[in-house]
Amino acid sequence: MKRIAFVFSTVPHGTAAGREGLDALLATSALTDELAVFFIADGVFQLLPGQKPDAVLARDYIATFKLLDLYDIEQCWVCAASLRERGLDPQTPFVVEATPLEADALRRELANYDVILRF
């Protein structure tokens, strides 16, 4: 089976990309355990708890990221540079446990995957 990487690079509530990516991730996890999740650029905002999507008439799907453990999705990475650029601390309590990696290390890790799906 091919190794699949899901890359979240967009803000959570401006488009449906994040929600659709999460749905695809959970569905794919039923078919393979060779997958990982990467949060880069504005995608790091997907990890923040306490969002108020109802203020912009959006659905609150962020809590669904907590299901990753239940689905045995354990490989979660977050770009440390993206966190810094957005004024976020790697010690922030995220909705899922994601390991911070510098950009070079993150690219090397991402290169280990056969398929990369970006949301």
Curated annotation (Swiss-Prot):
Entry superkingdom: Bacteria
Coiled-coil residues: none
GO cellular component: cytoplasm
Entries under InterPro entries matching the protein: DsrEFH-like, Sulphur_relay_DsrE/F-like, Sulphur_relay_TusC, Sulphur_relay_TusC/DsrF
Family of the protein in this entry: Belongs to the DsrF/TusC family.
PANTHER family given in the database record: PROTEIN TUSC
Subunit annotation: Heterohexamer, formed by a dimer of trimers. The hexameric TusBCD complex contains 2 copies each of TusB, TusC and TusD. The TusBCD complex interacts with TusE.
The protein's name: Protein TusC
